[in-house]
């Protein structure tokens, strides 16, 4: 067994005769939670699910809570690394691909879907080499590096927003069923009296810029008739409470909101970042928003996400800079006193919603697996999975030979040998359709 893969001791399913769907996702909640939503749908249909993630990453804590077996790879991101680490990247990636192949041969998935993250790259490449039906779901309008690469040979490319890839299928981002089930904006907002309810979402880690800008902007408005509920993350809770106290603004400051459906139902307006999952929830709930994209987001993808809602008049976009508090004050001055505008934004958001995204993604996965909702053929009835024992022996021999040649060679030469070993040992899997259920990718 490769030291680059850590295999779960939990079997994929009580019956070894049922092939699972493998989910590749990790690193951030934006990748993990959509995967969990789809996993819930698949399992409700009787389809087992297995997960491939990265050692020590967020998915290793979240996924087991849902009783989903997870295997992990020793892999990290490449962006922002020093030159020495980047030079060694090809070797690490090839080893991770080989380790991922080991996991896939053990799990024998009927289909593999990438939601992005560190382990998704090696996992997706291994799926391609072994002929597994590979799909990609990209949550953001600006595609991540991993999904951008995998999209080149994926069977289907699914997106949360239109305009991410050529030939994409914009199915939306999965949201929790209780959020999608909220009444229409008119049923919630028309005829409301009392304070305007402003929901501020800083994400699980909090957003210091919102902790500072929102109290400052509200204080500058001269204490309007507003009720504030601010989700700030555990680490920044004290900081947020101090900011509101200094601004003499009453607010309920919470590190975490468990019932987001109730929070959206309560809100007249939301001030938040522009992560893909958050925007999908805003649309599903039908609530207007003021979006402040995270300035350091990779490829500025949050701004691209926000522009989609702004283009539909469902949100206002404010850039994160030194003048944010002043501009937020100006925007709030208009929105807090204009219920018709808030309702219009909420209705516009609701028209963008795709509440059945998780169901549609599950449908497409099973279509590409060639199984629909039917139970797949037994593993032993299929004509070969991945590579046979003889090929595996050959691969291991070649790998040992390559390992013996590492000493004294440059990183590039070592990576070249690894690539040659990997591709030679999997050539039959690439050229022969049907090694996985559903055929080659």
Curated annotation (Swiss-Prot):
It is a peripheral membrane protein. SUPFAM superfamilies: UDP-Glycosyltransferase/glycogen phosphorylase. Keywords: Cell cycle, Cell division, Cell inner membrane, Cell membrane, Cell shape, Cell wall biogenesis/degradation, Glycosyltransferase, Membrane, Peptidoglycan synthesis, Transferase. It is an enzyme of class 2 (transferase). The keyword Metal-binding does not apply. Disulfide bonds: none annotated. Its main location: membrane. HAMAP family: MurG. This is UDP-N-acetylglucosamine--N-acetylmuramyl-(pentapeptide) pyrophosphoryl-undecaprenol N-acetylglucosamine transferase. The lineage of its organism: Bacteria, Pseudomonadati, Pseudomonadota, Gammaproteobacteria, Lysobacterales. The gene is murG.
